[in-house]
């Protein structure tokens, strides 16, 4: 293969990954922006809605726990193709559940979507980390930026369809159908074999240290837990938080969610430059503090204008947590699929615990007060941000040789 053909193949591979990050964001936002309507159709309380969302958490955790084995057994290409296809099936189940007004079936649909999305996300990130190493530059934040761009597009469509009175059932089904062609076109650019038969590192980290004794990896897990909680709580609860906590209309609640996704998108598309310029530690710490400021203003200030600005800060603050911790995890040793899975699993604990916890607290104390938990975790992430530091050159060379 010539240099030009290799470069072109890498470029096509990168754009395919952009699509595979964009599409899950679009699908996620397609139902997340309709949560007020979904709650009304299913006739559930806030606490019961938290229980329904628990299906997403269970599915996501199940998928991500299997992801490292799947990637090492079948390779990223096959895992991405199958799991992304199953995610579309999950969306179709959501539409059917709304048509049947079945909270249980909706939770099952979220479980299918979550399991597919969880497995796909690890495979996509492993593929993205491989591309990042080949390009020798920071690109994972931009890839995650396409996820945020997808959520922004989905939020915009959701706002428009809500304003025009299009039923959530129809909206979610259309989103699933739109996703079919991009999956089967983009997968052609992904090479076969990435991550397949990777070294077995499920029990030990660098230099034979068990994962549960790898202090840096554990602290990276704390960072991703906090930042994923901040991101996930907005994805699950922000429209309802604005409708019930600040008195916005459902359409305005979708608009506010679009502001959050705008902040996420801008942060991820610009994050690579800041990381290369200032270091991962500085960027994680600044992001966490910015997110804490935005969340704090939403909790303590009763102003529509302030809420609109604050969700952008929230989005900017949460934007780089996941991609940076994925990059940091891949630095700790040679077994990228397992290490990415360990950190991603920790992050998904936030998605597992978050919806029911915030739903329970919101039912008893109000959603604004429930967000104090998110605020505390984001501040903790700023404190332990040093864990995401890049290894020195000698350590990095030793890991690459291994």
UniProtKB/Swiss-Prot annotation:
CDD domains in alphabetical order: MFS_MosC_like
GO-annotated molecular function: transmembrane transporter activity
Domain of life assignment: Bacteria
Keywords: Cell inner membrane, Cell membrane, Membrane, Transmembrane, Transmembrane helix
Transmembrane segments: 12-34, 49-71, 78-100, 104-126, 139-161, 165-187, 208-230, 253-275, 282-301, 305-327, 340-362, 367-389
Pfam families listed in its UniProt record: MFS_1
Keyword Cell inner membrane applies: yes
Membrane topology: Multi-pass membrane protein
InterPro entries, alphabetized: MFS, MFS_dom, MFS_trans_sf, MFS_Transporter
UniProt keyword annotation of rRNA processing present: no
Ranges per topology, Periplasmic: 35-48, 101-103, 162-164, 231-252, 302-304, 363-366
A Gene Ontology term for the protein's cellular component: plasma membrane
All ranges on the Cytoplasmic side of the membrane: 1-11, 72-77, 127-138, 188-207, 276-281, 328-339, 390-402
Intracellular or extracellular location(s): Cell inner membrane
Disulfide pattern: none
Protein name (Swiss-Prot/TrEMBL): Inner membrane protein YbjJ
Gene that encodes it: ybjJ
């Amino acid at each position: 293969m010539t240099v030009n053909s290799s470069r072109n193949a890498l470029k096509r591979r990168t754009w395919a990954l952009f699509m595979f990050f964009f599409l899950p964001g679009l699908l996620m936002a397609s139902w997340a922006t309709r949560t007020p309507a979904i709650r009304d159709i299913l006739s559930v309380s806030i606490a019961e809605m938290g229980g329904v969302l628990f299906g997403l958490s269970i599915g996501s955790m199940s998928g991500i726990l299997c992801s490292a084995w799947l990637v090492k057994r079948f390779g990223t290409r096959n895992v991405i193709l199958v799991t992304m296809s199953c995610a579309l099936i999950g969306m179709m189940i959501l539409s059917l559940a709304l048509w049947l007004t079945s909270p249980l079936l909706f939770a099952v649909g979220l479980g299918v979507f979550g399991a597919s999305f969880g497995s796909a996300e690890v495979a996509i990130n492993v593929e993205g980390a491989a591309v990042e190493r080949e390009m020798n530059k920071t690109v994972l934040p931009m890839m995650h930026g396409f996820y945020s761009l997808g959520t922004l597009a989905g939020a915009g469509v959701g706002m428009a369809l809500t304003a025009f009175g299009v039923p959530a059932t129809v909206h979610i089904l259309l989103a699933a159908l739109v996703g079919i062609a991009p999956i089967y076109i983009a997968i052609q650019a992904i090479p076969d074999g990435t991550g397949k038969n990777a070294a077995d590192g499920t029990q030990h980290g660098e230099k034979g240290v068990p994962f549960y004794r790898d202090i840096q990896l554990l602290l990276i897990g704390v960072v991703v837990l906090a930042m994923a909680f901040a991101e996930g709580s907005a994805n699950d609860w922000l429209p309802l938080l604005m409708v019930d906590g600040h008195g916005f209309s459902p359409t305005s609640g979708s608009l506010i969610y679009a502001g959050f996704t705008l902040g996420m998108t801008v942060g991820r598309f610009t994050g690579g430059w800041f990381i290369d310029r200032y270091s991962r530690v500085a960027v994680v710490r600044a992001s966490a503090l910015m997110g804490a400021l935005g969340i704090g203003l939403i909790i303590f200030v009763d102003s529509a204008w302030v809420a609109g600005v604050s969700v952008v800060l929230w989005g900017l603050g949460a934007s780089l947590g996941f991609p940076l911790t994925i990059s940091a995890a891949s630095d700790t040793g040679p077994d990228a699929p397992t290490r990415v899975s360990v950190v991603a699993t920790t992050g998904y604990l936030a998605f597992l615990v978050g919806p029911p916890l915030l739903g329970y607290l919101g039912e008893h104390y109000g959603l604004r007060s429930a967000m104090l938990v998110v605020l505390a975790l984001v501040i903790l992430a700023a404190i332990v941000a040093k864990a995401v530091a890049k290894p020195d050159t000698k350590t990095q060379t030793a890991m690459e040789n291994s």
